Amino acid sequence: MKKINQYKLLAGICALSLFTACDFEELNTNPFEMTDEMGIRDGVAVGGAVTAMQRAVVTVGTQADDTEAINQYQVAYNLSADSWSGFFGQNNNWYSGSNNTTYYLQDNWVAATYTNSYTTLLSSWKKIKQESEKTETPEIFALAQILKISAWHKTLESFGPIPYTHAGEPALVIPFDSEQVAFNAMFTDLTAAIDILTVRAEQGATIVADYDAVYAGDTRKWVKYANSLMLRLAMRISYADETTAQKYARQALNHTFGVMTSKSDEAQMSTGAGMVFRNNIEWL
């Protein structure tokens, strides 16, 4: 009799565990809290990363950032490329005149250019890549690819070889790609991104609209921007590789949506994604 009771008790425990296992996930889910799946569907999970990447293409901040972003832009770009191009002149005498504006390069200023044009957006790009693969949202990763190339082509043109084709991989040492390899990879990535977003644009779809501070999720405008970026890269390599340059220049110009041709196409950040941005040049 004692053994029979033990078997009954054991059977009851097993049955109870089966019922509780069925309800475990439901019982342990907060009905008032957003799940990961909901976050992806609404763009919350990657939306912040998209905005962060946009703010890193050309360093830009808000009032909440005080002058941090302005100072970063000044050191990374204004005291180097902006000045060397002849668009701006400086009225300060940093390092007793031995600074980038007099072609005496300061290591910390050069490092700031690399950090702001390459390193800053890497973590956001990796997050979008991982999430888009898990949730099968290639259109969001396509946007991230366009933003990445918008920033990294400046690094490539300023420093030469950069880690590109293996960037973001979990390895102790990431190899650098030659300029030719990096440019070709950028063309390939841009082509893939444009193809994906073109389909979405033809469907009239928007993506991460609440977090896109540039075009508010307008996929058609992103395609035109990406085509314009492709044309710009093609012109950059025209003397080094005329055949490749012609191929991608024609591809950009002959695309259904073409390139940017009017003021309404411009990619600028003044207000968007719930923020008001400061114009670095006005403050400098």
Report residues per predicted region:
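Sec-dependent bacterial lipoprotein signal peptides
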Residues: 1-20
